[in-house]
Amino acid sequence: LAKWVISTWQAPGANATHKGTFLAKNVTIVNGVLCLTLTQSTVSYGISSKGGEIATIEKFGYGTYEYSVRASSTAATSDAVGTPVSGSITGCFNYLTASATEIDIEVEGNERNRTTQLTTWINEAKPNEHTDVSPAGALPHEGFFDYKFVWTPGKIQFYRNGVLIGTHTKVVPTEPAPFMFNHWGTNSINWGGLATPDVIRYMWVKNFRFTPL
């Protein structure tokens, strides 16, 4: 982890009845695989979420980004059987302050766990978003999926398991940014789903590779 920074700040998804933070202890290496843990608990104001996030020290620009991820589930080891649980986001993305650059591949933990969200932002302007449905019999929480996006001037192409699943030619960032993996909680009837207190969830990451343009 020498080339990465572990986050210890407020997580996304806060509202009047939900607050989340990233904890250093929720980022571990287990048998050579990165594990980001998420827990949720009931507190006086509603729900408290404790997740994990890690970011590269180096900023990356145009090129090919590749990584293998098993989306949030109850699988306590990277090869165990696990189920998705409402109230979580599996995030894989590059990000620069105030979304000057943001290119996301995300998986929700609620009933829409079959979908992959592909989103690009520039300075928090209205995003360019595409939702892709996972192929039947291959769900992102059941095992590792190989994700890739190719970022070139004016275009981003998104791949899952070698198959092109989305192309963006609008709202395409230009500035280099760190790359991040995160696992954070939600408590919403929409994005990510309502919280599930007292159930530990795990996101697993096998590798990350960047090839410059």
Model-derived segments and their meaning:
Residues 2-33:
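Extracellular glycan-recognition surfaces and repeat-rich motifs
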Residues 27, 32-34, 112-116, 156:
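Hydrophobic residues embedded in beta-strands of well-ordered beta-sheets
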Residues 36-115:
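Secretory/extracellular carbohydrate-interaction modules
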Residues 54-65, 135-142, 199:
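Extracellular/lumenal carbohydrate-interaction signature centered on repeated Trp-anchored short motifs
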Residues 64, 174-213:
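Ligand-recognition surfaces built from glycine- and aromatic
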Residues 65-67, 143-151, 156-158:
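Short tryptophan-centered beta-strand motifs in secreted/extracellular beta-sheet-rich domains
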Residues 95-144, 189:
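Glycine-aromatic-enriched beta-strand/loop faces of beta-sandwich-type recognition domains
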Residues 161-180:
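Short, solvent-exposed beta-strand-to-loop segments that form ligand-recognition rims
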